[in-house]
Amino acid sequence: MPLYVIDKPITLHILTQLRDKYTDQINFRKNLVRLGRILGYEISNTLDYEIVEVETPLGVKTKGVDITDLNNIVIINILRAAVPLVEGLLKAFPKARQGVIGASRVEVDGKEVPKDMDVYIYYKKIPDIRAKVDNVIIADPMIATASTMLKVLEEVVKANPKRIYIVSIISSEYGVNKILSKYPFIYLFTVAIDPELNNKGYILPGLGDAGDRAFG
């Protein structure tokens, strides 16, 4: 299963600040940017590369690495919470082409944990994805029921990219299993997997509403 939980001391340190309800809006956004950059570098370890030879200023030839896939990256930003996360990803992939998807889910407040939520895509602008060439990275800080992500994946899978990556900060166990059971070939990168969802579909312990905490 291509699931990567990046639970290193530095990522968990940043995540702890994100979870803290006393972290202010500016620092919340900055920490999302920091994690986006780190997760981008982790993704780069799975991209195609070639061994090359270069000559140093001292006239000595040496072997090196050229990550060829750095020229074949498309980042899709699920508005609005993913904006700082994508800012960090772009620091790792400065040549990436970008797309945006605006999606909203119908809020629920029942007695039981929702297994699916109605999602409406109100805006979509995605660059052409080259089949079996481009690596598509879909960014969303929180994967709860995975209803939004599955809706976006329906669009991306049709383009038949080389690889599809999902980047999140916190994912629920339910959401991860739901995505990877339907699309077992997808690479899912997250910092933490939380065990529960509440009756509104929010992750517990989570970090609250990422969009509201980042932008008010």
Swiss-Prot record:
Its EC number is 2.4.2.9. Its cofactor is Mg(2+). Allosterically activated by GTP. Inhibited by CTP and UMP in combination. 5-phospho-alpha-D-ribose 1-diphosphate binds at R80, R105, D140, P141, M142, I143, A144, T145, A146, S147, T148, D209. It catalyses: UMP + diphosphate = 5-phospho-alpha-D-ribose 1-diphosphate + uracil. Optimum pH is 5.0-5.6 at 60 degrees Celsius. Binds 1 Mg(2+) ion per subunit. The magnesium is bound as Mg-PRPP. GTP binds at K30, N31, L32, V33, R34. One of its GO terms (cellular component) is cytosol. CTP binds at R29, K30, R37, E87, G88, L89, L90, K91, A92, F93, P94, K95, A96. It holds the Pfam family UPRTase. Keywords: Allosteric enzyme, Glycosyltransferase, GTP-binding, Magnesium, Nucleotide-binding, Transferase. InterPro entries: PRibTrfase_dom (IPR000836), PRTase-like (IPR029057), Upp_A (IPR034331), Ura_phspho_trans (IPR005765). Pathway: Pyrimidine metabolism; UMP biosynthesis via salvage pathway; UMP from uracil: step 1/1. Uracil binds at I203, G208, D209, A210. GO terms for biological process: GMP salvage; guanine salvage; hypoxanthine metabolic process; IMP salvage; UMP salvage; uracil salvage. SUPFAM superfamilies: PRTase-like. Homotetramer. HAMAP family: Upp_A. Catalyzes the conversion of uracil and 5-phospho-alpha-D-ribose 1-diphosphate (PRPP) to UMP and diphosphate. Belongs to the UPRTase family. This is Uracil phosphoribosyltransferase. It comes from Saccharolobus solfataricus (strain ATCC 35092 / DSM 1617 / JCM 11322 / P2) (Sulfolobus solfataricus). The lineage of its organism: Archaea, Thermoproteota, Thermoprotei, Sulfolobales, Sulfolobaceae.
